[in-house]
Amino acid sequence: MAYTLPELGYAYDALEPHFDAKTMEIHHSKHHQAYINNANAALEAHPELLEKCPGALIKDLSQVPAEKRIAVRNNVGGHVNHTLFWKGLKTGTTLQGALKEAIERDFGSVEAFQSEFEKAATTRVGSGWAWLVLEEGKLAVVSTANQDNPLMGKEVAGVSGYPILVLDVWEHAYYLNYQNRRPDFIKAFWNVVNWDEAARRFEEKVATCGCAK
């Protein structure tokens, strides 16, 4: 069963003025779709791998034939990352409860967490992602290059952990609206974080990868 583009669950202009509608439309319908197309092409001869949860597939790339591994890492990784990103966006939610308590425990304050997250997102050279992850019961901020995901583990991605929150810092995520002002885009992110989804991922520690095919 081939991967398909997941619905956002909200309109392209739902995150205005922080994330503009044109960027959201192109990012979702063009960029994400391209990763899906490439992932399906890479796995066309391996339907048994297409049946797996994409998150479970990238968590153990040794399942993938060596000649397809880079394509799967980049394109299934891109599919998983973008799906998590879309689910993590919403206006009007509030950080509270167990996740807020854990952030204050592990970073000292919400403000200190935000500062560390912004630094990780700002200093990621080139294309990549900033993440809040849960590893061995503790929250941490990490960043990955290209379409790597902490689920891939340290040997592949250089970092590891279970994704709670993620921000795309590829230029295509912000350039139409923010041009070279990546720090402004990162600041705007706090206005559209879906804290309810982040809390769900933290509290339930869901076993599935959280992404649709």
Curated annotation (Swiss-Prot):
Family matches, as InterPro entries: Mn/Fe_SOD, Mn/Fe_SOD_BS, Mn/Fe_SOD_C, Mn/Fe_SOD_N, Mn/Fe_SOD_N_sf, SOD_C_sf
EC class (word): oxidoreductase
What reaction does this enzyme carry out catalytically? 2 superoxide + 2 H(+) = H2O2 + O2
Q: What is its EC number?
A: 1.15.1.1
Q: Which Gene Ontology cellular-component terms appear in the entry?
A: cytoplasm
Q: How is the cofactor bound?
A: Binds 1 Mn(2+) ion per subunit.
Which residues bind Mn(2+) per the record? H27, H82, D168, H172
User: What Pfam families does UniProt report for this protein, alphabetically?
Assistant: Sod_Fe_C (PF02777), Sod_Fe_N (PF00081)
The organism's superkingdom is given as Bacteria
Give the GO molecular function terms. Answer: metal ion binding; superoxide dismutase activity
Q: Which cofactor does it need?
A: Mn(2+)
Q: Which UniProt keywords apply?
A: Manganese, Metal-binding, Oxidoreductase
Q: What does this protein do?
A: Destroys superoxide anion radicals which are normally produced within the cells and which are toxic to biological systems.
Q: Which family does the record claim for this protein?
A: Belongs to the iron/manganese superoxide dismutase family.
Its subunit composition reads:
Homodimer.
Q: What is this protein called?
A: Superoxide dismutase [Mn]
Q: Which organism is it from?
A: Mannheimia haemolytica
